[in-house]
A protein has these predicted regions:
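Substrate-binding/catalytic subdomain of NAD(P)-dependent oxidoreductase enzymes
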Residues: 67-170, 189
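General beta-strand structural signal in soluble alpha/beta enzymes
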Residues: 13-17, 40-43, 135
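Oxidoreductase and adenylate-handling cofactor-binding alpha/beta cores
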Residues: 25-38, 49-61, 91-105, 200
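Electropositive phosphate-/nucleotide-binding environments in soluble metabolic enzymes
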Residues: 19, 23, 35, 46, ...
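Catalytic, metal-anchored helix/loop core of enzyme active sites in primary metabolism
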Residues: 40-42, 50-53, 57, 69, ...
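A conserved regulatory-domain signal marking ACT and ACT-like small-molecule sensing domains
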Residues: 201-292
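A generic structural signal for well-ordered alpha-helical segments
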Residues: 6, 70, 126, 245-248, ...
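Rossmann-fold NAD(P)-binding glycine/threonine-rich loop
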Residues: 1-31
Length: 292
């Protein structure tokens, strides 16, 4: 609505700071990468949750303890719901998806999971597998549409987002011509955010009587069903090995130091729908985290 109004009035509405704080990503997607079909955007888009997950990994702390620490340091709000439930990252991936597809993406249509269920035990399993748990916001091109999701994921050490820690953000972009690119930097804080805001003000002043084109039409994009996307899944359960194999078939069992009285395993790659069908056959599932 605001973009259309700006075009009508021959002025500009810019919002670089809305995603990634001081990281330039809106302008690159809107201008530098317009020759590409953007096939994937995957990002760590919330500094608060990234700080919390980093601290849980380094110290072995539980969620409640790192949340209090983040609040004491001013990284998390008194009501942290938007951050820890993934809503902030969801709105940001909706903005980026709208930019690359040129249509309106409703964040309410994006499947979103936060980090409130992540525990110190999950971190132990991730470390045993040589992985790190990150809250990822992902959008992938599926046919003529996109599929978007926000959820915690286990990343291997070779993934470009694996070393992104603390309050930093990073956005991985794959284009059909460009290939892979990554944008990294301070995703929050008054000075990084001010840098992006002032840059927009300078851009507006430079093009005072010209409307800079931005392809974002009001027509709503119907997102592809996330349940058709494939992943591997890490699962913790109280069930025994026979029950696990009966439900999921071939799996890779994982042992974590200091964890007893349960099983951890990684499934073969399958759709979300297939996982849900198999999980319904297994009692006492304690946790599920997607594995990249």
């Amino acid at each position: 609505e605001l973009i259309a109004l700006a075009k009508e009035k021959n002025v500009n509405f810019l919002f670089e700071a809305s995603v990634g704080g001081g990281i330039p990503i809106i302008r690159p997607l809107n201008s530098c990468l317009t020759a590409d079909v953007i096939e994937e955007i995957t990002g760590i888009l919330n500094g608060t949750t990234n700080y919390m997950l980093t601290k849980m990994s380094v110290e072995g702390s539980e969620f409640a303890d790192v949340l209090k620490d983040a609040q004491d340091k001013g990284y998390a709000e008194k009501d942290p719901t938007a951050d820890v439930e993934g809503f902030d990252a969801c709105r940001k991936i909706a903005i980026l998806t709208s930019l690359v597809c040129g249509q309106q993406v409703d964040f309410n249509d994006i499947h979103t999971e936060g980090i409130t269920k992540i525990s110190a035990t999950d971190i132990k399993y991730a470390k045993a597998m040589g992985k790190a748990i990150k809250l990822l916001a992902t959008s992938r091109k599926v046919g003529e549409s996109y599929c978007a999701m926000v959820s915690p994921c286990m990343l291997p050490q070779e993934h470009p987002l694996y070393p992104v820690n603390d309050v930093f953000n990073a956005i991985f972009v794959h284009g059909n011509v460009l290939g892979d690119a990554m944008f990294y930097g301070s995703g929050a804080g008054k000075l990084p955010t001010a840098s992006a805001v002032v840059a927009d003000m300078v851009e507006i002043a430079k093009f005072k009587d010209t409307n800079l084109p931005m392809e974002w039409r009001p027509e709503k994009l119907e997102l592809a069903d996330y349940k058709m996307v494939t992943n591997r899944f890490f699962v913790r359960t109280k069930a025994d090995e026979a029950a696990v194999k009966n439900a999921f078939g071939a799996v890779e069992f994982v042992a974590a130091e200091g964890v007893n009285g349960e099983l951890g395993f990684v499934t073969e790659e399958m759709t979300e729908a297939a996982y849900e069908e198999k999980a319904a056959k297994l009692a006492d599932i304690l946790q599920m985290i997607r594995v990249k």
